[in-house]
């Protein structure tokens, strides 16, 4: 495994070169971080270069780093993380890109390179609000079309903004503001010598 990772790391360093922001090797996996401006071009290189040959995209997910390291993280907030597979070389790579603008997270779409990125990018858009430039059908995939916000963002309230219910007078489903009141629950601790027959 180590020799295979050495070979892959050397190939990435040789082919991608100075466009690498970070190349981290941890727990038997490589993570390549690139600039948003180079993201699509590097994706195409990773797929087409014979020494790399990542012909399959397995997954794309969004990440919100706003609370990372207990708030000690000071980098960009949103990232798109792609997981790539090379069947011909039998190796994997994690490709990470940070959106340069936290207020409007925008990165290039990988759908022209790997068509399987379509629904994964839609999910990252729906859950995190990351916009994939060049995606031909970027719309919500898991939440309602009228949903407000992006539920996997760390600043999204756990209760949400609105709730859905059936209104018998209107004979249809309606949205209304959330009626749940925030409360603090303090757990009750029972300290008995013979609790649960453990002694």
From Swiss-Prot:
One of its GO terms (molecular function) is quinone binding. It is found in: Cell inner membrane. It is a peripheral membrane protein. GO terms for cellular component: plasma membrane. Its EC number is 7.1.1.-. The keyword RNA-binding does not apply. It catalyses: a quinone + NADH + 5 H(+)(in) = a quinol + NAD(+) + 4 H(+)(out). Keywords: Cell inner membrane, Cell membrane, Membrane, NAD, Quinone, Translocase, Transport, Ubiquinone. Transmembrane segments: none annotated. NDH-1 shuttles electrons from NADH, via FMN and iron-sulfur (Fe-S) centers, to quinones in the respiratory chain. The immediate electron acceptor for the enzyme in this species is believed to be ubiquinone. Couples the redox reaction to proton translocation (for every two electrons transferred, four hydrogen ions are translocated across the cytoplasmic membrane), and thus conserves the redox energy in a proton gradient. NCBIfam families: NuoC_fam, PRK06074.1-1. HAMAP family: NDH1_NuoC. PANTHER family: NADH DEHYDROGENASE [UBIQUINONE] IRON-SULFUR PROTEIN 3, MITOCHONDRIAL, NADH DEHYDROGENASE UBIQUINONE IRON-SULFUR PROTEIN 3. Belongs to the complex I 30 kDa subunit family. NDH-1 is composed of 14 different subunits. Subunits NuoB, C, D, E, F, and G constitute the peripheral sector of the complex. This is NADH-quinone oxidoreductase subunit C. It comes from Leptothrix cholodnii (strain ATCC 51168 / LMG 8142 / SP-6) (Leptothrix discophora (strain SP-6)). The lineage of its organism: Bacteria, Pseudomonadati, Pseudomonadota, Betaproteobacteria, Burkholderiales.
């Amino acid at each position: 495994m180590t020799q295979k990772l050495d070979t892959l790391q050397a190939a990435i360093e040789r082919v991608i070169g100075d466009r690498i922001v970070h190349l981290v090797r941890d727990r038997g996996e490589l993570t390549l971080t690139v600039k948003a401006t180079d993201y699509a071009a590097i994706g195409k290189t990773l797929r087409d270069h014979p020494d790399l040959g990542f012909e399959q995209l397995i997954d794309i997910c969004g990440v919100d780093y706003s609370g990372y390291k207990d708030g000690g993280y000071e980098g960009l907030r949103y990232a798109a993380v792609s997981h790539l597979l090379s069947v011909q070389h039998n190796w994997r790579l994690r490709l990470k890109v940070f959106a340069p603008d936290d207020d409007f997270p925008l990165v290039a779409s990988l759908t022209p390179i790997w068509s399987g990125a379509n629904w994964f990018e839609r999910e990252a858009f729906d859950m995190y609000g990351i916009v994939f430039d060049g995606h031909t059908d970027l719309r919500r995939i898991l939440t309602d079309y009228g949903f407000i916000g992006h539920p996997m963002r760390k600043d999204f309230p756990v209760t949400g903004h609105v709730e859905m219910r059936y209104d018998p007078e209107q004979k249809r489903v309606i949205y209304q503001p959330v009626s749940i009141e925030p409360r603090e629950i303090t757990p009750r601790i029972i300290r008995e010598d013979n609790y649960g027959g453990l002694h």
